[in-house]
Amino acid sequence: MNDRVRSRTIVSAQSITLPKGGDVHLVPPPPKPCVTIVVHGVNDLAGCYERIERGLCQGLNERLDMPPTLPGGQANPGYLTPAGYSLPADDEGKAENPDVVYYRRKFASGAGGAAVRSVVVPFYWGFREEEQYINKTAAHGEWLDRNGNRLDKSGTKEGGQFVNATTNLPDMWGQGFNGKLFGFISLDWFGGTMTHPLFSAAGRKYMVLAAMRLAMLIKIIRKRYPDDTINVVGHSQGTLLTLLAHAFLKDDGVAPADGVIMLNSPYGLFEPLNEKLQGWSSQQTREARLATLKGILEFICGRRHPVPALSSVALRNCQGYGAIGGPGWVGGQGCQTTIDGERLSFDERDNRGSVYLYFTPQDQTVGLANVQGIGWRGIAEQVKGLPGRTGLPQGFHQRIFTVRKRNGEKEKIGGHAPPHVYPLLLAGEKTWEDTGLGGKDRFGRANFDQGDSVLLTAPRLPLPTEARFDFDGAVTAPGENSASGVYQVRDTLDPIDAAIGVSNGGWKEKDSGHAVAQQVDAALAYRYGRDARSVERALNEGKELAQQTHVFSARELGTGMVLVTRAETPYEARLRLQTAEGHLEPLSFHSAIPNNPEHNRRVLAYDLAIGAGDSVDDVVFYQYLCRVADWRLDWKASDKGIFSQGDASVDLPDEEVRALYRAEESKNSQLIDATVAYRKSGEFPVVVGNRLPSLVGTQTILDRYHEQAVRFGGTI
């Protein structure tokens, strides 16, 4: 069958055949408006995906005038409903193997038990340590890589180690973070924390593998449904994967995504001294960074796909099946919808061929002195005398999310008609004022210069909104009442970060500071003797390392019970670190944009490109895409051993999905299989070569010193 011509079931029901009765009236759901692939960053189990999907579905419903019920009172079959996710709140974060249990998307189970009707394809990627280098016997029970970084119990790290994030694309082919300043000073000693150690890390080519997989995912969609409207929403390092994936697509002759949205991107256009001190003459120049960004954005913005015309999928222009919106959505000027109970009008815009950058000056991660990413400062008109935003295509737009107040008012996202100049720093302001950062932490951050500004070119929104970064945690005094409006938020650790803390000094084997008094049956406690070491042996027998303890003393109570005073187990330490009493950590605001569902509802949903989403209407193909996008999943019943707290059956494809896998073109199958092999063994796929795609430019500062021009593509 031609890939362009496919039939599928739109709606179905069952009924008993009866004379003059038994009719079932079916209301077909309208087509979905788009496909949206979400890509996470480093050190990330994609905890923000649930909030992105929840906000996007609600926002798209409002944008398309798609209420939950129809005028007659029946449920609206076109209403988008997000998938549910397994979250720490489900069981108070008590799962013993948190990496396997939490932040897993439930494909068939929507939020609140409703049926899933979504446009989101969640993409997952990461690093796998080679088997022989995994330390599985540390006393705290956590697995470690060769450099002492925590891994999950399958030897992987979702998104790779936090320190391995890059500010450019060529570095993804390079060595990992070396952990040293000037080659010998420990950066962990200088700037590491319990949950974010600055240990050395493995080479970064697993990021190239992830970008190849993302490009393959888009290619698979394009082959089967060439007119689908595809968005890629990348967060943090996921934005660089998105850029690199498009460079691969260009060389493969495949059309780009229709819309790209980059959140909190660490992509840098400068040459920070702190970065130079780690890589010396191998640092990429601003010329290469700008040229690469310009070329990739021109590829995305220059291939605008006009099919379907938005007016052609509006209800008033569709005879029968085909409209993606409700009665108020007309696909152009004069759309109407209801938001917060009020009816309002807005002009629809065709976002195909657009790239949006969301940035925040309060991002303390990409605002680090060795990063200075565009997700912190946006893109200025000029960058050190070179064309910055002015050199990028017209389809590039940027929005600022800031909690800073000026003249007592907060900046409204989408509140200005473009273009609008936003000063990053006015007289009397300081870059990191009221953030709660101490002197040492401020020293490690970059600063704006007075007079720095960015041109905000993103269109107005139907309902301009304020940025709020306090969706999680508790705001510390004085909060929004500070002179600048900037505030600090402190929050408890999630189970993954708490486990990192356990592996990095948050638990000590013989620490009496968190001693536990426990009554134990004498027959158990004295099984091997009455001394402390014998009692310890009895208590630890047959238990995982994370459940073992050190016994300080044991005293018989005379009631058949023994009072054992012992140290907390690593597992108990993890649970302690997950509480406000155990540990509170200030948020860096690096995930503050996607972590607030209201940002996704009121901003992101309107910047997505819409038109057609047949691939996520095709139920089996949608399931297939979600499997291809998740590197943690296998295609055969061979992974049950690591899913001790999950239902392994949900991680295996059914026969229809497996048939799509078997029919996949050879090049894609090889990449899918190589990814599975890498996840299982750490053996890196040979399919990931050492050649840059043609849109990726490279020039080190040493190259520039020797007057060697920016080189595009070729061996690196």
From Swiss-Prot:
Main location: secreted
Compartments where found: Secreted; Host periplasm
Residue stretches in coiled coil: none
Any GO CC annotation of this UniProt entry: host cell periplasmic space
Source taxon at top rank: Bacteria
One Pfam family, short name: Tle3
UniProt KW Ligase keyword: no
Residue ranges, annotated region (Disordered): 68-87
Key words of the record: Host periplasm, Secreted, Virulence
S-S pairs: none
InterPro entries given in the database record: AB_hydrolase_fold (IPR029058), Tle3_ab_dom (IPR056221), Tle3_C (IPR021692)
UniProt activity-regulation remark: Neutralized by the immunity protein Tli3 in the periplasm of P.aeruginosa cells.
Purpose: Antibacterial effector. Is toxic once delivered in the periplasm of prey bacteria.
Assembly with partners or alone: Interacts in the cytoplasm with the adapter protein Tla3. Interacts in the periplasm with the immunity protein Tli3.
Name of this chain's protein: Antibacterial effector protein Tle3
Encoding gene per record: tle3
